[in-house]
Amino acid sequence: MTAEGSGSSTAAVASHDPSHTRPSRREAPDRNLAMELVRVTEAGAMAAGRWVGRGDKEGGDGAAVDAMRELVNSVSMRGVVVIGEGEKDHAPMLYNGEEVGNGDGPECDFAVDPIDGTTLMSKGMTNAISVLAVADRGTMFDPSAVFYMNKIAVGPDAAHVLDITAPISENIRAVAKVKDLSVRDMTVCILDRPRHAQLIHDVRATGARIRLITDGDVAGAISACRPHSGTDLLAGIGGTPEGIIAAAAIRCMGGAIQAQLAPRDDAERRKALEAGYDLNQVLTTEDLVSGENVFFCATGVTDGDLLKGVRYYPGGCTTHSIVMRSKSGTVRMIEAYHRLSKLNEYSAIDFTGDSSAVYPLP
């Protein structure tokens, strides 16, 4: 009706004419969990932030687990932990197989590492992060058979030349060519472990530079995929759970990771073979996380190449997070300001701040 109460106007009639109807979207946008999920890693980082440099890995990790477990049950999803703190008998919370979320929303695989780099956190060193990944139910690789895998990761521009079965020297040269760099311009990120002595020797023989990290190869893999990070390639053996979480991030960024399972001993090798795993198979990014709707969130605990750590001010703190979604390709960097006195009024998590001080607005 028009404002005067008479019949339909010409414009109103036209709006109902099928020839004037806008083409509908192919599908309604599904619920974007990213902003809900980042609250979980923020909570983990803020809880662990109180333990930085105190020499207690278990204390810091436990605080992060408690905080994340409390927050994750407010997230609109029906999640199952596929990568968590271990088996139920050894992990009271966030154990493998635990159901998480508020019971509404999509069915999801949930992978979490409350602190990637517990040693880094306990010593106050750089690059400790709180991290999680979510994907469609049944799309994450089962990491239970073999604890370690050999990995190589690179960003989108060189994803098509990666070959974990080739010598590292060939991979370095191939990536350098695609990126229009000299081999001597390349930087390879490697975990500083005795098992990597030959790998380090081979990389040095090419003339490429090396960045050795003591822990935290999830952050290292992400750095290899981000432009202007100073890292061009990640290589070496690290944890299988961390490899799957890194693959979720890499799916969102369009990079590539390849991996092969690396049993520690004959017993683990037999376990993997009996479970039907092919130890010679090259696992691609899509093999590790096959879903089309993947979310990844990380919040810095200590300062690092990727994220700033938790910073405390009178009455509050700041957190720095990265949030990614594969379906949209969106990568968000979020700097959040938290007034701890306000949080403690309603939160079951004790973030313990000076409630009498002035809140630091941005």
UniProtKB/Swiss-Prot annotation:
Inducing stimuli: Is expressed during exponential growth, with mRNA levels approximately half of the level of sigA.
Top EC class, one word: hydrolase
GO molecular function, one term: fructose 1,6-bisphosphate 1-phosphatase activity
Binding residues for Mn(2+) 2: D113, D116, E242
Residue numbers binding Mn(2+) 1: D61, E85
Amino acids binding substrate: D116, G117, T118, Y148, R193, P194, R195, D215, G216, D217, G239
Pfam families, alphabetized: FBPase_glpX (PF03320)
Region annotation Disordered: where it falls in the sequence: 1-32
GO cellular component terms given for this protein: cytosol
Thermal dependence, as annotated: Retains its full activity until 30 degrees Celsius. A significant loss in the activity (65% loss) is noted at 40 degrees Celsius. Complete inactivation of the enzyme occurs at temperatures greater than 50 degrees Celsius.
Localization per Swiss-Prot or TrEMBL: Cytoplasm
Catalytic activity: beta-D-fructose 1,6-bisphosphate + H2O = beta-D-fructose 6-phosphate + phosphate
Residues recorded with modification N-acetylthreonine: T2
GO biological process, one term: fructose 1,6-bisphosphate metabolic process
Main subcellular localisation: cytoplasm
EC number: 3.1.3.11
Activity control summary: Is inhibited by Li(+) and by inorganic phosphate.
Polar residues: bias regions: 1-12
Function: Catalyzes the hydrolysis of fructose 1,6-bisphosphate to fructose 6-phosphate. Seems to be the major FBPase of M.tuberculosis and to play a key role in gluconeogenesis for conversion of lipid carbon into cell wall glycans. Does not display activity against inositol 1-phosphate.
Description of how the protein assembles with itself and partners: Homooligomer. Probably a dimer.
Listed NCBIfam families: glpX
UniProt similarity note: Belongs to the FBPase class 2 family.
The name this protein goes by in its record: Fructose-1,6-bisphosphatase class 2
